[in-house]
Amino acid sequence: MGGALSTEAQRASSVEELSQRLAHRFATKCFTPLELTHLKDNFFSRALEQRGIRYWNEEILSDFLGIPDGAGSAATATSDGSLDAGPVIFRMVSYLGAFPFQNTMAPTVLTFEAMIKVVVLLTERYGKVLKRGKKDRIKLLFGSLADVGRRDIITQLKEAAEDSLESIGVADPNGGSTFAHNGGFLIDQPINDGEDEDDDDDLALAALESLDAIEVFKQDQRIDKTVFESKISLTTFRRLLTLLIVTAPLRPLGTVSKYTTGLSKSSLDTVHEQVDSILAALGSEVAEDGIGYKSFSELISTSLPYLFDPLTPLFEHLLFSKNLNLSRKSETSNGQADKPAPTPPSTPPRSPPLSPVILTGGFDSCILNPVILSHLSFFISTSPHIPNIFRNRTHLHPVFSSTEHGESLTSFSHHVMTWQAPTILLIRGAVTSENNEEQITTIGAYIPQPWKQSSSYSSRRSSESVHPSTLPCLFEIFPVHTVLQGSPSFSSLKSNMPVSHFSTKTGIAIGCIIPPSSRKSLGSDLHPKPAGGGSLLIDSALENATFVVSDGLNGEGVFLPPGVSPSGTTTTGTTSTKTPSSTSPTASAASVSTSNHNTTKSISIYNLEVWGIIPSQSLATQSDGTGSPIEKQDAIALQRAQWNFEAREAERRQAINMKVGGGESEAQTGRALLEMAGIIGDSQYSAHPHH
C-alpha cells in the first residue's frame, strides 16, 4: 500500500514538474524578453496571494481584458446579459492553464505558469516549440468550453482554489506536504485503457514529445472517450459567439470596451440575429441537449475556421503593461546614474489612423454592416499570409448596388466587369414559404478572380497546395449559417464550369454548368444548370435568384457540399473524396447520384451588392525576377482607366455611326460591322480588358 502511495506521489510530482518545464519553455521560446517582462508586470501587479501562491481570479481577468462580467468593473454591458462572457472565458483559461495535463490538473489555479500557457495557446504561438504539433486547437477548445456532463463547474472551481494550491506542493495547515491532485473534470478522468491512440490530442502529444515525456502521457493521460460525450451548453456558446462577433475588429492593443459597451439596441439585435444563424446551423436538437464534439468540430473546421481569431489580440493585451516604465535610470556600482538607454515607451505606440474596412464613397450599403462583416471574417480569407480580414487590413470598396445603380445587367457589367480584383457578392431578399409567409434571407459568394464572361484561369497543377483565399466560397449568413467551400480542383474543371458566368441573355450564374451556345439550343437548353455541392443563379432582370444546396454532389463542380472543407478532401484528377465522414462526395459529371437531396430556395431580390477587395499596401506587392518588390496597380485606378477607355470607345463608335449615314439600313450595316469587330455587343466582354 505504501509503495502504491509512493508511486502515485512520484507520478504527481512528474506531472507538476513537466507542466512547469513546458511553461518555462513556452516563456523562453514564444515571447521576446520585453514581452515576458510586460507579462510579468501585468500578472504580479494584480495577482492575489494565498499560502504564498500568486494567482488571478475571474474578476481580475475580466477586468483586465475588459470583458463584460456579472460582477466587478466589467459588469453587465447589456440588459439581457448576452455579453457577460467573463465566466465563459475564465472557464476556458482554467482548463487551458492545465495543458497538457487537463485530465488530472484541470481546472487549475490561474498562476503565472498557467497564464503563460493560456497566452501561448490562445495566440497560437505554440508552433515555435511544438514543431510537430498540428495547429488544430478544436478538441482543446471544445474541452475548455464543455460544461454539460461534467460535475458542477462552479463548485469545482471553488474547490480548485484550495486543492490545486496543495497540489503545487504547499504545506497544509496541519503540517506535512502533499501532492493531493485536483481530481480534474469528470469527463477527463482517464478510462478506456485499451483504446487506440489515434484520437489523442495532437497538441498534448507534441508538448509531451518536446519534453521527452511520452511515457508519462501514456500512463497519466490515456485518451478519455467521455470527452466526446460531454457537450457545450447553448448559453455558454451563445455568450462566446456574441463576444467574438462584437470584438472581431479588435486590433492588437486596441480598446476592448470600445466594442463591448455602448451598443445600441439595433446593433445588439443584429448581433443576436447572426448568433442565432450560427446556432441554427447546428440543428434544432442542440437547444435541448447542448453541442456535442462532432457537431462543434464539423462547424468550426468546415464553415468557421477563423471563429476564434479575436481571442489573439484580446490575450495579447497581457504582453503590454501600461504601468511598466522601462526608461528609469539604473544605478551603477559607483552610485552614478547611467544615461537611459532608448527603450519602448510605457504607453502603446501611436499607429497611423486606420481607414475602416468598409470604404465609403460609392453608395450606402443596405446589406453590409460591421456585424455582417464580423460574421464574414469567420470564414472568408483574403490573403494566404494573414487569412483574417481584420488582421491583414483588407479594405472593401463599393463596386455595385442594385439600389444605387439600378437593376440592370448593363449597369452591373459596367461596374463589376471592369473591377480587376476579387469581390464579395451579397444578396438580401425574401423566400416565400408554403403558407405564403416571407422569410428574409442573406446569401452571397466570394469570387477570388475578376469577373469576365469567358472564364479562364491561370494554370495550376492539381498537386499544388491551395489556400482558402484562392478558392471561391458560396454562403448563406441568415437565417441559417451555411458555407460551401470551393473545391481544391476547381481550376482543373472543364471550361463550361466556371466559377462565375455573366450573360445578358441568361443572367448571372455561380458554380453552374454553362450549356454550349449554338443555333440548335433553344429555350431552357441555354440556361445554366446547378452542379457540385451548390450553385447560385440570378435572372437577367436582377429580380430573382435561385440558391441550390446539395447534400451530396451533383457531379463534379466548383463548390463542395456543406460540412466539407478543402483540407478534408483528397484530390485525384477530377474526383474529390471526402475524408471526414462516410458520405463520400466522389462523383463525376456523367454519374449524378439520384439519391442526393437538393435544397432549392427561390429568392425575390431586395438588394444586390458587389464589394471589391483591396488588399493592404504591404500585401499588394509581388516580386520580379530579381526578388525586388513590384507594386501592383490599384484596382480602383484600373477600373477608372477601363471606364475612360470605354468612354473613348463610345465616342469613336458614335463618330463611326455618324459617318455610316442616316438611313436605317445603313445604320444596321454599320452596327453589324462594329459587332463583327468586337467593339460593341456581348463579345466586348469576352476579351481581356485593355490597359
Swiss-Prot record:
Region called Disordered, residue ranges: 329-355, 559-595
Domain TLDc: 366-614
UniProt subcellular location: Cytoplasm
Biased composition, class Pro residues, residue ranges: 341-355
GO CC terms: cytoplasm
Keyword check for Ribonucleoprotein: no
Highest taxon of source: Eukaryota
InterPro entries per record: TLDc_dom
Comp. bias intervals (Low complexity): 561-595
TM region positions: none
Main localization, broad class: cytoplasm
Keyword Cytoplasm tagged: yes
Keyword field: Cytoplasm
Similarity annotation: Belongs to the RTC5 family.
The protein's role, per its UniProt record: May be involved in a process influencing telomere capping.
Full protein name: Restriction of telomere capping protein 5
